[in-house]
């Protein structure tokens, strides 16, 4: 590792420990020339997940965009930000665990709806109305009937 102070290439690792719940390693190093210490982080490089949109264009998966869409559906509902963060974590893990590098926006929407249905039914209906693009009151009522019949 190149010393950030003098540029010398050789150093020694003084301390090494896991961070971020084991997803990275923090290493404390000492330069062999100037003896100054510095910290480096080692993390597994992951390939970005690409989302295939309805128009077939591709866009990098954006966790914040997903969270914001779910937040809108949960406005003025008794759902904590921690619950929403966990919901997004679960969806992100599900996508990564599928080992696919591409996922459709339709698949993501279905994952969100499945999780929201268990978390808050009003938020589920709000999200479904945007995601499924309800054209009129009848399609909205059909979704509500499905939800009631499942109970």
Curated annotation (Swiss-Prot):
Q: Give all residue intervals belonging to the ATP-cone domain.
A: 49-139
Query: What molecular function terms (GO) are annotated for this protein?
Result: ATP binding; DNA binding; zinc ion binding
Please name the GO terms of the biological process aspect recorded for this protein, alphabetically: negative regulation of DNA-templated transcription
Per the record's keyword annotation, is Transcription included, yes or no? yes
Keyword 4Fe-4S annotated: no
User: Per its UniProt record, what Pfam families does this chain match?
Assistant: ATP-cone (PF03477), Zn_ribbon_NrdR (PF22811)
Q: How is the cofactor bound?
A: Binds 1 zinc ion.
User: Which residue numbers delimit the unnamed Zn fingers?
Assistant: 3-34
InterPro entries with a match to the protein in the record: ATP-cone_dom, NrdR-like_N, RNR_NrdR-like
Alphabetized UniProt keyword annotations: ATP-binding, DNA-binding, Metal-binding, Nucleotide-binding, Repressor, Transcription, Transcription regulation, Zinc, Zinc-finger
Cofactors (names): Zn(2+)
State what this protein does.
Answer: Negatively regulates transcription of bacterial ribonucleotide reductase nrd genes and operons by binding to NrdR-boxes.
NCBIfam families according to UniProt? transcriptional regulator NrdR
Identify its protein family.
Belongs to the NrdR family.
The identity of this protein, by name, is Transcriptional repressor NrdR
Q: Please tell me the species this chain comes from.
A: Acetivibrio thermocellus (strain ATCC 27405 / DSM 1237 / JCM 9322 / NBRC 103400 / NCIMB 10682 / NRRL B-4536 / VPI 7372)
């Amino acid at each position: 590792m190149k010393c950030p102070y003098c540029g010398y290439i050789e150093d020694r690792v003084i301390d090494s420990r896991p961070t971020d719940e084991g997803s990275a390693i923090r290493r404390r190093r000492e330069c062999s020339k100037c003896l100054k210490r510095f910290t480096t982080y080692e993390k597994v490089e992951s390939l970005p997940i690409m989302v295939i949109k309805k128009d077939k264009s591709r866009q990098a998966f954006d966790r914040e965009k997903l969270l914001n869409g779910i937040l809108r559906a949960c406005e003025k509902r008794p759902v904590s930000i921690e619950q929403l963060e966990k919901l997004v974590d679960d969806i992100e893990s599900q996508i990564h665990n599928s080992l696919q590098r591409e996922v459709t926006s339709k698949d993501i929407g279905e994952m969100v709806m499945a999780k929201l249905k268990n978390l808050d039914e009003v938020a589920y209906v709000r999200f479904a109305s945007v995601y499924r693009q309800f054209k009129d009151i009848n399609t909205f009522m059909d979704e509500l009937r499905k939800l009631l019949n499942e109970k």
